[in-house]
Design a protein with these regions (language model features):
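Bacterial Sec-dependent N-terminal signal peptides
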Residues: 1-22
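Short N-terminal segments immediately surrounding and downstream of signal-peptide cleavage
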Residues: 20-37
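Conserved hydrophobic/aromatic pocket- or pore-lining residues that grip, position, or stack substrates
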Residues: 29, 49, 126, 201
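Active-site-proximal loop and beta-strand segments within enzyme catalytic domains
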Residues: 20, 59-175, 182, 189-195, ...
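A short, well-structured edge-of-sheet supersecondary motif
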Residues: 34-67, 99, 150
Length: 201
């Protein structure tokens, strides 16, 4: 993400009306890759809704040396958390749910490590990293790629994860509760998280 922002800032230093050549883009991208020690990147420049340049630079992996092209897909990792939170905010703006609604109102099967937390857990709590679970708690249910745990499996297994702090008292980065948030989006909108994000964001 920080590389995308830096590249966007570099490209924005040119006047809006100025024509930037492909060679100038190449130099900017190559300098950015060197500065951040990035092996590969795909770049697209879009103007007035049309792609004017789409190009890959470098390699996907320093081990395989397979080249990046304009169609190379990169994992976006935790950038999806922003999409999830934005999707929840859209549904809240549409009065379909509220930040302070209880998760069990939408997902009755949702259970945390104790009854109080389960019943008090709100939509807001799903995205604030203050559940009481430790950093990366339960992540082995989703990593490495290829894990066969489904969303419902993850929701069902949350109750077995032990807290490291009291509910809402400490920040610990979390991944699994965003999967729960995605299921709330599914339940409220009638669309899978993927379809909702694709259509609305």
């Amino acid at each position: 993400m920080k590389y995308s922002i830096l590249l966007a800032l570099l490209l924005s230093t040119f006047s809006i009306n100025a024509q930037i050549t492909e060679k100038e883009v190449d130099v900017l991208v190559e300098n950015t890759m060197k500065a951040f020690n990035v092996p590969g990147i795909a770049v697209a420049i879009v103007k007035d809704g049309k792609v004017v340049l789409a190009k890959g630079y470098g390699v996907k992996s320093i081990l395989t040396k397979e080249k990046v092209d304009a169609n190379t897909l990169f994992g976006i990792s935790s950038n999806s958390k922003a999409f999830t939170t934005a999707a929840l905010a859209m549904l809240i703006d549409e009065k379909k749910l509220n930040w302070d609604d209880k998760v069990i109102q939408y997902l009755p099967e949702f259970k945390m490590y104790n009854e109080y937390v389960t019943h008090e857990f709100t939509i807001r709590d799903l995205v604030t990293h203050r559940s009481g679970l430790g950093l990366g708690a339960g992540d082995l249910m989703i990593w490495p790629d290829g894990s066969d745990f489904k969303e419902n499996d993850i929701i069902r297994n949350l109750q077995h994860l032990k807290p490291v702090s009291a509910f809402r008292t400490k920040y610990d980065y979390d991944n699994l509760l965003y999967i729960v948030a995605g299921e709330v989006i599914h339940k409220v909108s009638g669309k899978s998280w993927c379809n909702f994000i694709e259509e609305r964001i």
